[in-house]
Amino acid sequence: MEKLTITRPDDWHLHLRDGAALKAVLPHTVRQFARAIVMPNLKPPVRSVADAAAYRERILAAIPAGGQFEPLMTLYLTDNTNPEEIIAAKASQFVKAVKYYPAGATTNSDFGVTDIHRCDAVLAAMEQVDLPLLLHGEVTDSNIDIFDREKVFIEKYLIPLREKFPRLRVVLEHITTSDAVQFVLSANNIAATITPQHLLFSRNALFKGGICPHFYCLPILKREEHRLSLLHAATSGNPKFFLGTDSAPHARNSKESLCGCAGCYSALHAMELYAEAFESVNSLDKLEAFASFYGPDFYQLPRNTAQITLMKNPWRIPAELPFPESGLVPLRAGEEITWQMV
């Protein structure tokens, strides 16, 4: 296949940052996607409907001239979130979900939940008004091996959560293991997003020729057997699995440092990366549903009507992109990629 035209996709897990960083990265997403679920982990985080409304206006103001893009907002769940805020979020129409970060799990997660059991009243309100919960599904116990933190989270927290709130719609975000795939398949009212890096790379990519900080993200890349399980899930045609890049921009000097930030930047070339992954298992015919149908169906939103086209036209990913401070290094910077969005 040399050409692929599909319904315009959406990104169901995206970091846009704020200020000058927002203005630097937003054009990449606007070019590829019609909508995106925007993560709330700013400094300070987006904790209220008022915060979300203000952030949404800043995003809309940064859309390039002629661009068509709808930011779908989220609230940052904390120990102090109250049920009244959930009711207001649902009524707002522009807040589409609430994000759970375990405190300290990833970038700007210091305000996260210290004990999910403290959130029972809020989760009950979310179940009642049908507002989805988005989970960064890792435990933060330093005694748990970093490669096992998703599996342990499912066993320790997610299984009891499903039993307590069976009608709550849940997205287990950026899944990385066969354990997560099997859990999502077995549970009702639960879906999962999958990133391009977790479809394309195993943990070997982190250490190819030395430490490779631009492949470091959380949850961390896993064994090859887990990558293959994710690839099978993404290309299976099961509507529980859909696109979420988790594209996370960090300045080069924040990645290439003694204690580098977690996150891969893929918004520039996300659809090309996904196309490469799907083509690797002869499943390009499954890409449209994964990228364009299953996400809006889960969120009970209309599917897009516009289209995009990808062509077999090899090109080289830039070594660096403009970004505040010290530039932004995209995933697989400097390498050739087969597909190109036209």
UniProtKB/Swiss-Prot annotation:
Residues carrying N6-carboxylysine: 99
Binding residues annotated for substrate, in chain numbering: 15-17, 41, 136, 218, 250, 262
Any one GO BP annotation for this protein: pyrimidine nucleotide biosynthetic process
Source domain of life: Bacteria
Family annotation (InterPro entries): Amidohydro-rel, DHOdimr, Dihydroorotase_CS, Metal_Hydrolase
One of the record's GO cellular component terms: cytoplasm
Binding-site list for Zn(2+) 1: 13, 15, 99, 246
Entry keywords, A to Z: Hydrolase, Metal-binding, Pyrimidine biosynthesis, Zinc
Enzyme Commission number: 3.5.2.3
Pfam families: Amidohydro_1
UniProt cofactor note: Binds 2 Zn(2+) ions per subunit.
UniProt-recorded Gene Ontology molecular function terms: dihydroorotase activity; zinc ion binding
Pathway: Pyrimidine metabolism; UMP biosynthesis via de novo pathway; (S)-dihydroorotate from bicarbonate: step 3/3
Cofactors demanded by this protein: Zn(2+)
Function according to Swiss-Prot or TrEMBL: Catalyzes the reversible cyclization of carbamoyl aspartate to dihydroorotate.
Quaternary context: Homodimer.
The family this protein is said to belong to: Belongs to the metallo-dependent hydrolases superfamily. DHOase family. Class II DHOase subfamily.
Protein name (record): Dihydroorotase
Organism lineage string: Bacteria, Bacillati, Cyanobacteriota, Cyanophyceae, Synechococcales
